[in-house]
Amino acid sequence: MIRIYTQQTQGQAWLSNHQQKSVVFACGLGFTDTALIPNISAAGATPEARKYTAIADAECICHGFREKAIYPLPPLIVGASPAILSRAILSHYQIPAYLFDTGLWLKPDKNAVDCIDVSGQKARCVSTGKALEFSTVNKLFEQGLTWGETLATQYLNHLFVLGECVVAGTTTALGVLTGLGYDANQKVNSSYIECNHDLKWQIVQTGLKKANLNPNPDPFAVVAAVGDPMQIFVAGMAIALSRTQGVLLAGGTQMLAVYALMERICKYHSLDFDPKNIAVGTTRWVAEDPTGDTVGLAELIGEVPLLATQLSFQTSQYSQLQSYEQGYVKEGVGAGGLAIAAHLAYGATQAELLAMIERTIVPYLAAN
């Protein structure tokens, strides 16, 4: 059910060390105005719908299907929200979940989303070169560290799955990786069946040109220029957690960018973290996406093992799930990481995961 794509020895050691540990899920919700650019993301069929994607996904995570959802899941171009996959696993195994508003389009209604406000702000478009205030980046990082320390004390000897929900987050990931000096062009993924590399690259290049960063920039300055609020918050949380706990950064390109950011922050600001406790975990739809190069990107960053669940929807009776097999949607809201954790911690099989996901999706399909 789990395949190691990079850093085989380290990946095997990480898997062995975290078998049968209880799981805690934490997810950084954020927004970047980059999501409003036409054709930048398929996570919401229109720019207007994409304003609410993270909030609707969070309501799904918190409550599952509700006939009168305050923020209904937005229509996608094809497929079904990955929040449905995450909700199925969280609900079935009663995994504690913490959702953090790092900077959303709007403050969610408390009756819809039980999330923790960490006083962030939504990001401006990457193309501005001024995505976030430096002070906001600093504050979000400190909040991440504090929450990581708090959760590590509350849940001893657990596996922490850290997810994200940021529409257009692969573009901010490309921005941060490029700003840190990685040659990530043509390597990131997308919610589209064919990754829109040229559009992403054009946006990133415009932003970096305006930002005019130093040759060896402070990683906080890189996030302030072309990043998003989730990245810096989750980086802080993962750094703190890694000192004593197992951490699975649940995502593809976006979490590889978070790992690269963590590594650079610790080096630049002389902080400690334990790379042995960290892996990046995603779906095979991301890891094997022929229109990106997640494996190449992981190898470029080095050190961190890239894992992917081998979960398959080929035999699903629902076309919305089968569309994942055709390259649509692929990942989000920690879905791949939670599937990995479900197998590691609770021995979940392919048949069991498919059954629980299909049970969870039925009321959504009936309502539409």
Swiss-Prot record:
Organism, as annotated: Picosynechococcus sp. (strain ATCC 27264 / PCC 7002 / PR-6) (Agmenellum quadruplicatum)
Membrane-traversing stretches: none
Name of the featured protein: UPF0284 protein SYNPCC7002_A1742
Protein family according to the UniProt entry: Belongs to the UPF0284 family.
UniProt GO molecular function: nicotinate-nucleotide-dimethylbenzimidazole phosphoribosyltransferase activity
